[in-house]
Amino acid sequence: MSFPNSSPAANTFLVDSLIGACRTDFYSSSNMYMPAATAEMGTYGMQTCGLLPALGKRGEVNHQNMDMTVHSYIPQTDTWADPSRSCRLEQPLNQMSTCTFSQSIKEETNCCMYSDKRAKVSSSEIPAYSSLIPESCSVDSPEIPVPGYFRLSQTYATAKNPDYDNETMSPNTTLMQLNRATPKAQSTPFVEVEKKLAHDRDTRSSSPAQSPEPKVSTLEEKNCSTEASVSSPELPHREGKESKNDTPTSNWLTAKSGRKKRCPYTKHQTLELEKEFLFNMYLTRERRLEISKSVNLTDRQVKIWFQNRRMKLKKMSRENRIRELTSNLTFS
């Protein structure tokens, strides 16, 4: 079929034109009146909406399927399908061969202007429907206009397009504003950090110049601590306790079950005491004083360590003796 490009009905079939025609032009008492300009438009809209079946061959009209009494909202449609009317569509044979539609096709396969009900047209179906799809109903268009009585007027479409453009541009503008605002928000912490660093440097540079006396006092305290460590042998004992608390993962400080051993002695001190215990389990007072000086422990600490070591040896020997006795016994 061919429409003149100048007429507005060539591209879209408008709702308001159909309503106005149905009220005034199409009906006069019981007879139907259709002008020559709107005759082709009416039959084209009825065919695309599924009200009239498609023509199978050129010049053939199925009179049984042309009965349109099912649609109660369009009266006197039987006269539209009269073959003697001048509104019959004559289409070329090569176009109508690809446009044969079965009666089982649902109305939902038509174009819809609502985004959630768009028809998903595949690449294989495009050439078959290309002859019936108007120019305004393109596949790639974001909103596909509805054929027939669902189409809106061009004035509404032109009025809606600026709003849609404004809505699409608004997210971009907001993103640009956010992008402009974020560098400021990010730059403020860096400026604050730089100010703090500069302030700390100033305070550090001013503090040595203002207070040279605390340095002298700290040196005196260090000297006193070294003298006290030489005079009193109990300080290494305390330092050994602190070092043990700092390193609880060492094997000689933890038991097999993971329990922390109560060991106030350093590893070097325990090794020296163990070597002396191998040579002699009982020490004289003179030898005990010598060992205490070499290991930086008091005489009493060395005495207690040897007592505990003898008790440990006694316990281990008892356990070994019991184990040997029980291993020789056989239970029947």
UniProtKB/Swiss-Prot annotation:
It comes from Danio rerio. Keywords: Developmental protein, DNA-binding, Homeobox, Nucleus, Transcription, Transcription regulation. This is Homeobox protein Hox-D10a. The gene is hoxd10a. Gene3D superfamilies: Homeodomain-like (1.10.10.60). Residues 194-261 are annotated as: Disordered. Residues 258-317 bind DNA. InterPro entries: HD, HD_metazoa, Homeobox_CS, Homeodomain-like_sf, HXA10/ABDB-like. Sequence-specific transcription factor which is part of a developmental regulatory system that provides cells with specific positional identities on the anterior-posterior axis.
